Regions:
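Short, contiguous alpha-helical
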Residues: 2-5, 37, 41-55, 60-112, ...
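Long, intrinsically disordered low-complexity tandem-repeat segments
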Residues: 7-22
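Short, charged, low-complexity loops and linkers
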Residues: 27-40, 116-119
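Acidic/histidine-rich alpha-helical segments that form the ligand environment
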Residues: 110-152, 167-176
Length: 202
């Protein structure tokens, strides 16, 4: 759902709230002659779109609903994957410390902070956090891969002074989504019965 697909009768105050909880689920197909970089980025974007479809448009109750015996929630997934996006860029591409809100958290003392604290966040804040992290990550990877060289070393150095290449971190990011999209499938079905693999496209 986008602004131009909403009824004309929706008041502006309601429209702002609705759009705050709507996530982009568009999937752009790769070219028929796509190389490795284009295909890797397409796979990541498709998983992001699938995740957005399963998490988008919900109120606080929907985002906080667990699927027993697991305590996992869609809100927790949004916050966790926002952290993963920012960590991936920080570790692999920039070598810079994490910014807000992550820099104020002692993850050694609270390793599950993003999962636990999501219950206190509004839907608008959770959606904005995830959107912002995706935008930063997308921009950072686009800049890093202007040379289309996934073999270049990342900014991360192991204790043995080795640096995994950028391919490793891009695959790791997609793998994290692939894992959690499956969780989101089950959680969303339990909320309102939504099922399916890919979000409907125009």
């Amino acid at each position: 759902m986008t602004e131009d697909t909403l009824p004309d009768t929706v008041p502006d105050t309601v429209l702002d709230t609705v759009l705050d909880t709507v996530l982009d689920t568009a999937i752009s197909e790769p070219s028929m002659t796509a190389g490795e970089v284009e295909m890797q980025l397409f796979a990541l974007e498709r998983s992001r779109a699938q995740f957005a479809w399963k998490c988008g448009g919900l109120d606080a109750a929907g985002l906080r609903k667990p699927h027993p015996p697991s305590a996992m929630t869609l809100g927790g997934l949004l916050k966790h994957l926002a952290l993963v996006e920012d960590q991936n860029v920080s570790i692999a591409l920039t070598g810079q410390p994490l910014g807000a809100p992550w820099d104020a958290v002692d993850f050694e003392a609270e390793p599950d902070w993003e999962w636990r604290s999501a219950v206190d966040d509004s839907p608008e804040d959770l959606y904005a956090l995830w959107r912002g992290a995706v935008q930063r990550s997308r921009a950072a990877w686009a800049e890093a891969l202007e040379d289309e060289d996934l073999d270049r070393p990342s900014k991360f150095t192991t204790p043995s002074a080795r640096s995994p290449n950028r391919r490793r971190f891009l695959v790791d990011l997609h793998d994290e989504y692939a894992r959690h999209v499956g969780h989101a499938d089950l959680l969303r079905e339990a909320v309102d019965g939504l099922v399916g693999e890919d979000p409907p496209q125009r």
